[in-house]
Amino acid sequence: MPEHTKVSAEDQALLNKFARSYQTQTQLKADVKEAKTLIDNINEASDEILLLDDEDSASIPCRIGSCFVHFNGDSLNEHLEGKKTTAEKVLSEKTSELDAISADMEQIKKVLYAKFGDQINLDAEE
C-alpha cells in the first residue's frame, strides 16, 4: 500500500487558495467570452447600419435596458462605438486578471504536485 503524505495547514491553505482561484478563473472565462460576444455583436450591428439607405437609417430602434430608443444612423454609430470601447476595456481587464490568476494557479500546482505527486489531481476536466 502506498504511503500517503500528511497534509499540513500550509498545504490545506494552498489547496483552498487553488479552489478559490479555480472558481474565479471559471467566472473570468465566462466574462471574457461574454465580452467577446458583445464586441462581435456590436461590430455586426455597425456593419448592418452601413448597409441601410438614408430613409431606413433615419430612425433605427436600439434596445437600452428594457426599452427601445430610436436613433438616426450617425448617432447610433456613435453610441455603438462608445459601447464597443467600454466592452474592449472590460475584455482587456478580464483577460489580464485571467492571465494573472492562471499563472498563480500554475505555481500552486507545481508546489502541490511536488509534495503530493499523483495522490492529487488539480487538472480541470474539460
From Swiss-Prot:
Name the record gives this protein: Probable prefoldin subunit 4
GO molecular function: unfolded protein binding
Annotated keywords: Chaperone
CDD domains found in the cross-reference section: Prefoldin_4
Family note: Belongs to the prefoldin subunit beta family.
GO biological process terms on file: protein folding
A Gene Ontology cellular-component term: cytoplasm
Function: Binds specifically to cytosolic chaperonin (c-CPN) and transfers target proteins to it. Binds to nascent polypeptide chain and promotes folding in an environment in which there are many competing pathways for nonnative proteins.
Subunit structure: Heterohexamer of two PFD-alpha type and four PFD-beta type subunits.
